C-alpha cells in the first residue's frame, strides 16, 4: 500500500505545481492588462470618450476606461460619493477631465482641492512632454493651476464675460468703458441694456480673486459684497431687460461668456468696424473663469501613462482637430468636439488665434487675453455671489423684502459672507 501512497504523494506535488503555474500565469496576464481610468462628467464625456479611444489606438496594449459622473442629480451624487470615498482611501480614477461649470462637481472648489494633496505635480512630466507645447498657452491661465508644489492642474478651456457691438450703433464710440467704475457710469443705452441683461454674470465677473486658498481666507470683504450688490441692483433697475428681436438691427454682434461661437460672430461682422471688450473686474483688469480642466490623481499607479493621456489631450494635433495618423488611413483624436473652443477658449493661444478668421477677432482675443488679472475656477463661492445678487434684486423689486431695509440688507450680505468663510475653511 506504500506504493499507492507514494503515487498519491507524487500526484499531489504535480497537481500543486500545475496549479501554481496556472495561478502565476493568471497573475501575469492580469499584470499585463493595465487599464487606465479617466473620470469625466456630463460636460466632458464626449471629449473624454474621443481621447480615450484615440489614445488607446496609438498605444496598443493599453486599455482605457471612462468613469462617468452622470447628468442625473441623484445618480451623480451617488457616483460622486463613491469616487470621493475611493480617493480618500488611496484609490480613485487615474485621470480627471472635468467641466468646472457642471452642477454636479466631484471637486466643489477645484482651486481649494489643489492644496489638498489630491493632484499629482506635473512639472517633471511636462518638461519631457512629447506633444503638448505649454509655451504656446495663455501663461496667466496656466499659472492658475500652480501651487507651491508646481503645476497640479492643467486648464483646458476658459472664458470671460465679453461684448461685441457694431461701432456705428454706439452713441459715444470713443468712450468705451474699461473699468468697473466706467461701466456703472456709462450712459450708452445699447451697452447698458446688454451688460444688464445677465446681471448675475456681471456680478460674478466683477470680482477679481475671491480668496487666498493657501491661507484659507477671503480676499473680498463683506463691505465689497454689499457695495457690489447695491451697484448691480441699481444698474439693473436703470436698464430693464428688453432684448430686441432683431439683434443685428440693434447693433449687437455677440455677448456672453466668450467661446468659439462668440469669435465666429465677430468674424461675421468683420466687414465693418466693431467694438469688442471684456467686462472689467474691480482690480483693474479682466477675470477669466476656467471652464474645463485636467489633472492626475496623486494615488495613481500609472503616472507615466496618465500624463501621456494629458499630453495627447493637450497636443496641437488634438486641439486643432487634425489628430494623429495611425494604421492605414486612420486618425486618432481627429474630431470637431474640441475646437474651436465650444464652451470656452482653448488655453492654447496660438491655435485660438488661428481659429479666428478675421483680424478684428484676432486683435480682440489678444487684447482681452492681455487684460486678464484673475483666473477663477467656479465654486460654491461663486454660487453664493450669484445667489446674493438674485436675492437682493428680487427683494428690491418686491418693495417689501429684506433688501429695501438697510439693516436687513446688511444681514443678508453678512449671512452670505459667513457661508463663504465656512466653505473656505472646511
PLM feature spans:
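Conserved N-terminal structural module of periplasmic/extracytoplasmic solute-binding proteins
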Residues: 2-4, 8-13, 20-108, 402-426
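Short helices/loops that flank or line small-molecule/ion binding pockets
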Residues: 77-92, 96, 107-112, 234-265
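Hinge/lid segment of periplasmic solute-binding proteins
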Residues: 100-162, 274-279
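Short, solvent-exposed loop/beta-turn-alpha elements that line the ligand-binding surface or hinge
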Residues: 121-135, 172, 190, 208-228, ...
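Extracytoplasmic/periplasmic solute-binding protein
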Residues: 144, 148-163, 179-224, 246-255
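Glycine-centered hinge/linker elements that transmit conformational signals in sensory
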Residues: 214-245, 252, 266-271, 275-279
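Extracytoplasmic/periplasmic substrate-recognition and gating elements
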Residues: 268-343
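Conserved C-terminal helix/tail region of periplasmic/extracytoplasmic solute-binding proteins
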Residues: 340-426
Amino acid at each position: 500500500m506504500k506504493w499507492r501512497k507514494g503515487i498519491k504523494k507524487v500526484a499531489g506535488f504535480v497537481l500543486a505545481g500545475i496549479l501554481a503555474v496556472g495561478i502565476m500565469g493568471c497573475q501575469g496576464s492580469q499584470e499585463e492588462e493595465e487599464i487606465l481610468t479617466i473620470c469625466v462628467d456630463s460636460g466632458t464625456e464626449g471629449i473624454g470618450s474621443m481621447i480615450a479611444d484615440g489614445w488607446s489606438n496609438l498605444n496598443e496594449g493599453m486599455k482605457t476606461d471612462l468613469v462617468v459622473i452622470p447628468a442625473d442629480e441623484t445618480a451623480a451624487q451617488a457616483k460622486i460619493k463613491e469616487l470621493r470615498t475611493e480617493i480618500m482611501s488611496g484609490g480613485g480614477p487615474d485621470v480627471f477631465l472635468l467641466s468646472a461649470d457642471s452642477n454636479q462637481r466631484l471637486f466643489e472648489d477645484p482651486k481649494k482641492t489643489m492644496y489638498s494633496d489630491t493632484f499629482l505635480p506635473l512639472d517633471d512630466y511636462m518638461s519631457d512632454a512629447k506633444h503638448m507645447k505649454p509655451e504656446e498657452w495663455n501663461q496667466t491661465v496656466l499659472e492658475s493651476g500652480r501651487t507651491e508644489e508646481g503645476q497640479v492642474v492643467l486648464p483646458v478651456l476658459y472664458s470671460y464675460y465679453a461684448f461685441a457691438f457694431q461701432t456705428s450703433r454706439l452713441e459715444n464710440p470713443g468712450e468705451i468703458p474699461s473699468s468697473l467704475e466706467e461701466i456703472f457710469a456709462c450712459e450708452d443705452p445699447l451697452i447698458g441694456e446688454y451688460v444688464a441683461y445677465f446681471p448675475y454674470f456681471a456680478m460674478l465677473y466683477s470680482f477679481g480673486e475671491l480668496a487666498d486658498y493657501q491661507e484659507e481666507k477671503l480676499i473680498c470683504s463683506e463691505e465689497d459684497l454689499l457695495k457690489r450688490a447695491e451697484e448691480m441692483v441699481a444698474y439693473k433697475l436703470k436698464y430693464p431687460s428688453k432684448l430686441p428681436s432683431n439683434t443685428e438691427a440693434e447693433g449687437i454682434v455677440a455677448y456672453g461668456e466668450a467661446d468659439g461661437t462668440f469669435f465666429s460672430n465677430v468674424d461675421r461682422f468683420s466687414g465693418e468696424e466693431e467694438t469688442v471688450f471684456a467686462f472689467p473686474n474691480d482690480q483693474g483688469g479682466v477675470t477669466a473663469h476656467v471652464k474645463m480642466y485636467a489633472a492626475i490623481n496623486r494615488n495613481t499607479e500609472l503616472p507615466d501613462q496618465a500624463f501621456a493621456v494629458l499630453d495627447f489631450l493637450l497636443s496641437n494635433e488634438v486641439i486643432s482637430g487634425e489628430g494623429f495618423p495611425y494604421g492605414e488611413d486612420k486618425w486618432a483624436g481627429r474630431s470637431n468636439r474640441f475646437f474651436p473652443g465650444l464652451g470656452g477658449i482653448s488655453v492654447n493661444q496660438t491655435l485660438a488665434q488661428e481659429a479666428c478668421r478675421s483680424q478684428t477677432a484676432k486683435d480682440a482675443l489678444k487684447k482681452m487675453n492681455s487684460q486678464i488679472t484673475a483666473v477663477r475656477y467656479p465654486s460654491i463661492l461663486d454660487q453664493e455671489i450669484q445667489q446674493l445678487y438674485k436675492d437682493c434684486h428680487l427683494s428690491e423689486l418686491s418693495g417689501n423684502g429684506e433688501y429695501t431695509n438697510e439693516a436687513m440688507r446688511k444681514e443678508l450680505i453678512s449671512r452670505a459672507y459667513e457661508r463663504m468663510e465656512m466653505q473656505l475653511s472646511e
